[in-house]
Amino acid sequence: MNLLNLPFAGPQQVFSAEWLEMLQIEWNRREGLSSQLRQVGFSSVVAFGVPHEEQPRAYLVIRNGEIDEAKKQSLGVPQWDLRADESQWQSWFSEPPGLLALGMAFTNRSLQFRHGNYPAMIKDPLMAESFVRSFALMSRAQKKLESEQQN
């Protein structure tokens, strides 16, 4: 239970089709993130999952900074595949991490990149800021979904 005594929708729900749809809406609605990614020409398949599972639980197809598709099934070979334990995802969706927290998570392997080059990405200020913003949007999507489910 969280501090408001409301059940937290854990990772199975975090990576649900409903959550992915909400993430796509929030991501594409927020001009800051998509315009930053458009500036650097970011187009990629990004996947999220947990370390002990072979396949990711969620896939995003990002074209010129905007999410074109967000699905639970494979949308191609991911260029970025981020993995973390379920409890870590829960923590990040409750309180989105900053750049320092993400760096520490990468260093201690609680955030793993099966595909993608974190050290190179983090050296680019626009990409680093976009990476942090993406976690904030994931949290926002989770909170909006929880709010809708309560009403």
PLM features: residue spans?
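Feature captures hydrophobic
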Residues: 1-151
